[in-house]
Amino acid sequence: FINSKRKNNLDNNAGRHDFGGELIKKLNYKFSKISNFHQNEPKPIFFENDLIFFDKKGSLIRFNESKKKVWISNNYTKTEKKSKPFLYLAKNQNILIVADSISKFYALNIINGDLIWTKNNSSSFNSEIKIYKDKFFVTDSQNTLHCFSIKDGREIWSHKTENTLIKSEKKLSIIINNNVIYFNNSIGDVTALDVQKGNLIWQLPTLRNIIYAESLSLKSSDLVLDKKIIYFSNNKNEFYALEANSGILRWKTKINSVIRPKIIGNAIITITQNGFLIILDKVSGNIIRITDIFDKFKEKKRVQIYPVGFVVGAKKIYLTTTNGRLLIIDIKTGKNEKIMKIDGDKISKPFINKNKLFIIKDKAIIRFN
């Protein structure tokens, strides 16, 4: 199953990367410390050989390959900077789209960092951003999906789903396929809408059998689409496969995971909250293999360690954890071959770009060959 090719980001199906680096530490891209880093899921933007990220005051920084700053752009007032906005980023050719945790969203010219337009929303944002043709999509903390124009930030349509008083710390997910947009909300609903007008196609409340109080603690993985089937899991011991056309349940199995699964060929790879690597058959949902990859952690510390995210390389799986470690796992055996200390606290999931691996800390991005 390791011969599958990587797919585009509209379906969140990264598959397998042709990466076999030796993980030699090469560069640190440094920025001022992000205080609420551990509560969020940061993602950099790669543009040609450069990297774009932000600091604690919301300043966007474009670094070149030698870690020199090409430009710095901050579009916040003194008061807004004190709120320490967390930024969600996406790019469309030479335009950088930003939505943040203090209800602002705006667009920059990636080449020079100049502001193109800026807008305000009634609620803060808490999802990945997806760009499709001349539009971009993002979900706010009120569980409302917005469709905006890339050109001027004008709202084209929005769709509100059921909301709760308690806001989820887990970033919400969006996927797009065949002019249909799918997204989850903080209480486990998965909704399918027409991309052009926002008309409802179907909606599935996945937590219908769980009492309301329990739904407030829900954390779900990203949605992943593969061949008309949507896959995702949550911390309520549920892994779902839904038919994208109808929302009908294809299968469900008991797996406790909140990180994005990878689909490679006929296999699904995921990692549970307590550190087990699981490979499933994507057609039936049957478990093919389970391997303990937290076995090298001491028992007392293990219960406090959780997976953050992983990528699949040519021969290895690279997994980061909440205690700042990078685990290198052999694909064939599922065994944990090596643990590298990156930091003493939570780090981001790994990112691979142009055969280099990147990991974000609260005040730097580390690049490995």
Go through each PLM region and give its residues.
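Loop/turn-rich, solvent-exposed surfaces of beta-rich toroidal or solenoidal domains
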Residues: 263-280, 286, 290-329
